[in-house]
């Protein structure tokens, strides 16, 4: 049974520049934003800059391999996706201006707009082409780079799973890996890998070239993906980092050092990475080359490292040194009762990118399905009585009516908690019609 129940909410203290950040939707991760509203306080921002603290150092800026929110910042703000969602959850054009689906061949075709890559100085390097998506996907599928999100590709793109697995086995053979269960890997002169597991017949894997993977640059502005099956959520997947483009020559030049600094990162999004110094600062500047630059209203986003951001942030807000900080419950009352700070405090925007919910265990007994098995519950948990209870509608309703959402949310959101209530699994902005 899952026990998560409430959504994380925070109280933010913000200076004037935060309003622009909210309107522009800049601080994004996983297609979402997190920013406080602004009113009344002195701020370091001039209306064109936005400064915040960070206290957790990202392990990488490589958007093609990471899977954590903090490390997605560069990919979310500095690299555009083929399609994107607007603030109402409606899918819009991104780097692709149109797309078509061929059900007979399970192929999506995307037509790209004119766009450019820029370096850390904002200078144009080269145009964005369909080949950049192909090269980026090959990078994700290269085991040496250990992409944490490779499963978002291998599960859906034709040939990707075979390509990735073969190269994992090949690496194992070349490095003499022996699995914990005794499985060994060998490779012959023709590149055929043999995997030998205990008590099993050896399995052989012929070489798989990347040409077998279902991604193709038809020309500079036409890109196709061929799927393993008709997956209705594929367009949504394109908003995730492993489907973002990367400049091929830069990937080839930098290898595992790609996106480890501003100099090894090229951008084609709303911002470009202008500077990055580990444990010091992180600066993104507006990209004037971006097709949607007219709708980006902040020129510079600066992140300053401060190991005690949660402690120092509120005081730095008062001094006008930064534009946003988290206000803890230990000082919230004093801020709200002080005429000089009360108007600086506002609730964070509700995050409707995900939900938490209870899921009951309806299978307390062991059972063998065609493709998986359930071990069942230990006798001490009385599986027979469990089954009787869990299949009783009134028993399940007791959980529904026994949870007081308001009381739970009020712990972290003492003011305005009603805005964060959610009584459905599907977030309200999950989908929308033309209206």
Residue ranges and their predicted role:
Residues 2-9, 31, 87, 113-145, ...:
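Extracytoplasmic/periplasmic ligand-capture domains
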